[in-house]
């Protein structure tokens, strides 16, 4: 509609309409951004296209009814730079999302795209590139937080005629859409980073494992790979060197366990997605038995900019042990739902109340779940906790891939733990008994408690079984699956007691614990 309106006013020779990736501010989408003046129009409908073109482009006047309104001051904010949601962020992995047409390689190149690859191939040795990544302090953004440069170094040191580089784009956490947004908004950054990884590790083949439910991300990735080949940035003798590298796409069926690297590799090989015992690690023996380096989308998105700006610049951002930024999918009972990127060390309070705009409808903050089904629920006492890998683990949660769900006073924490166990039981690969059977028993106990049939003894059994699963499950997904139960028991034990002792649910979410009475004064029918 915007293009049609531009053509109706005969402005097509001087005005471009560019479809970009996600701006991140999902609460206010769809969004139209006018450049160069950065006017930011929110919640735009197709019927608004004519007004935008006629008023803004022809008459030079802003369409005031479409401008963002600061809820605190009730004032219009025309420039996105002055909107709290954006001005408190630092975008590195998301640097190009919303700024370029992801289907146009020239726009990526105009923002220093493929410069890092060229520099690596023509000015640096594989060892010096790996050292730069190690010195930057970049850690895996998929949840484990393993040092990225060290993983590359391990893969490089293994002698083998064939090696592989894998991009894990299997994003299975409920409410998480970080990797999808990067692939939809900046696919060339992933192509470039994978080629750099291939150069460093000695791999000539790259594989992107992506769930088939991401059709737009898949389509834009295909376009990026094709364009890179046409420009000689993938294929034989890249940048006139003896380095050759190519990328293929592998599709996942949406199994949560396939986010675990060994299960992912099994799936790519056409086998059932099941985790395997480590060692051997994929870096030593992975896809088709060959050394395989696996990183996730967000990890790769940081690589080109580290080589461009230097390890010292990147390591100056964040905390002592967690460098750089982290992308989060901020969701739940918060005013500003969306995709955000903040420096490591930013507090939960700054994210939820500064960027997120606080709790919806003036309700009271109750908890925030970080790390998805593998994470934990943190309370008001954790709001000033600086976000990094170690702090979240110490608090009983984890970074995970970046899901962050905010809850208010109307949420039941016992029901929330049961919700995540629902997911875990459904998604278990079934290979090991602690996860296959143990989580089912956990879920049954939670079902018993929320149905009003729980006992005090059930609470002790619940905690004991959760601890056994955590200690004995085969893979990281199974080992972390009891976290929602353990963290809610640690932080909201009084709610568990109310469910089993008083048979009440303070949030009024557990229907079996609700009692309905008829008021005869009002029941006159």
Please tell me what each predicted stretch does.
Residues 67-135, 288, 292-310:
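Flexible inter-domain linker/hinge segments
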Residues 118-159, 315-316, 321, 329, ...:
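Accessory "access/gating" subregions that flank catalytic or transport cores
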Residues 133-155, 197, 254-266, 272, ...:
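Conserved phosphate/anionic-ligand binding catalytic regions in large, soluble enzymes, centered on
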Residues 186-200:
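Histidine-anchored nucleotide/phosphate-binding helix
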Residues 100-115, 165-179, 282-288, 329-334:
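Gly-rich Lys/Arg/Thr-decorated short loops/hinges at beta-loop-alpha junctions or inter-strand turns
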Residues 5-9, 193-195, 345-362:
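Short amphipathic, charge-patterned alpha-helical segments
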Residues 88-89, 218-344, 356:
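Hydrophobic alpha-helical positions that pack around
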Residues 1-19, 36-65, 116-133, 161-165, ...:
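Ferredoxin-type iron-sulfur electron-transfer modules in oxidoreductases and energy-metabolism complexes
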